């Protein structure tokens, strides 16, 4: 079975695992998913991640972060740009998530960036997801 939106699958696995209070979740790996996990780690939404090699595409293991071991740090993680409805923004149109409390993650010409970094760099791109 082919997957039409692997990024949405990754975000859904992270959302479900955090709601179920799991410490880690395994996701089929790709370069884009590793870049996305890198941004989530830098912003403090996940503890860590590692890529485990197998004979296929590899597995991305994401270690989730919780507040007092009970409440997940990720309250909401939502896909914005979808395969059937892409959302592109210019550097002056980058959305603010929850009045700056959350993060929008963009795919730009300079790589996967947060909304703040993209504004500072003056680049726009495709809005992958929002996290808060």
Curated annotation (Swiss-Prot):
Alphabetized SUPFAM superfamilies for the sequence: Ribosomal protein S8
Organism: Geobacter metallireducens (strain ATCC 53774 / DSM 7210 / GS-15)
Protein name, entry field: Small ribosomal subunit protein uS8
Keywords on record: Ribonucleoprotein, Ribosomal protein, RNA-binding, rRNA-binding
Cystine pairs: none
Complexes and interactors: Part of the 30S ribosomal subunit. Contacts proteins S5 and S12.
Function: One of the primary rRNA binding proteins, it binds directly to 16S rRNA central domain where it helps coordinate assembly of the platform of the 30S subunit.
Signal sequence residues: none
One example of a Gene Ontology biological process annotation: translation
One Gene Ontology cellular component annotation held by this UniProt entry: ribosome
GO molecular function: rRNA binding; structural constituent of ribosome
Keyword Transport assigned: no
Domain of life: Bacteria
Similarity comment text for this entry: Belongs to the universal ribosomal protein uS8 family.
């Amino acid at each position: 079975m082919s997957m039409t939106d692997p990024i949405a699958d990754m975000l859904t696995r992270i959302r479900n695992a955090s709601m179920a209070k799991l410490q880690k979740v395994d996701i089929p790996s790709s370069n884009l998913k590793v870049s996305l996990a890198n941004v989530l780690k830098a912003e403090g939404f996940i503890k860590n991640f590692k890529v485990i090699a197998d004979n296929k595409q590899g597995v991305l293991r994401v270690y989730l972060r919780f507040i007092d071991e009970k409440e997940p740090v990720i309250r909401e993680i939502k896909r914005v740009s979808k395969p059937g409805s892409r959302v592109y923004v210019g550097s002056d149109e980058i959305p603010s998530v929850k009045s700056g409390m959350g993060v929008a993650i963009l795919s730009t010409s300079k790589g996967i960036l947060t909304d703040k970094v993209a504004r500072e760099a003056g680049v726009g791109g495709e809005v992958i997801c929002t996290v808060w």
